[in-house]
C-alpha cells in the first residue's frame, strides 16, 4: 500500500503541475508508467475518488480561477485548458458549475462589485 500512496501523490503532483489542463487518465498513467485501470484503482483506494474525478476537480478549480481572476476570453480559457472546442467547454462548465462560463463570470463579477460597495461604506 506504500507504493500506492506514493503513486497517488505523484499523480496529484502531476495534476498540480498541469494547472488544470484537461488530460486523460491514460496520459497520467503513462507518465507514471502504470495502466489507467491501476491508476484509477489506487486513486479510489487511497482517496475515495477515481482518477477522472480528481482530473475534473483540478480542471473545475482552474476554470473558476480563470473566470474569476482573468480577462481571458472564454475561448482562450478553453484553449489554455486543452478543451477540444467551445461547445465541450461550455457543457463541461455547466455540468460542474451549474451555469455557462459566461454566466459564471457575470455572477462572480456581480459578487465582486457588491463586496466592493460594502467595503467602501
Task: List the model feature ranges, each with a label.
Residues 22, 26-58, 78-103:
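Basic/polar phosphate-binding segments, predominantly the helix-turn-helix DNA-binding elements
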Amino acid at each position: 500500500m506504500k507504493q500506492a500512496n506514493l503513486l497517488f501523490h505523484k499523480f496529484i503532483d502531476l495534476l498540480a503541475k498541469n494547472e488544470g489542463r484537461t488530460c486523460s487518465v491514460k496520459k497520467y498513467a503513462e507518465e507514471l508508467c502504470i495502466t489507467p485501470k491501476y491508476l484509477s484503482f489506487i486513486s479510489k483506494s487511497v482517496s475515495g475518488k477515481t482518477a477522472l474525478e480528481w482530473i475534473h476537480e483540478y480542471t473545475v478549480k482552474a476554470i473558476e480561477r480563470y473566470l474569476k481572476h482573468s480577462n481571458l476570453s472564454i475561448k482562450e480559457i478553453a484553449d489554455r485548458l486543452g478543451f477540444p472546442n467551445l461547445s465541450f467547454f461550455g457543457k463541461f462548465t455547466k455540468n460542474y458549475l451549474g451555469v455557462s462560463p459566461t454566466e459564471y463570470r457575470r455572477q462572480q463579477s456581480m459578487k465582486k462589485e457588491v463586496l466592493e460597495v460594502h467595503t467602501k461604506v
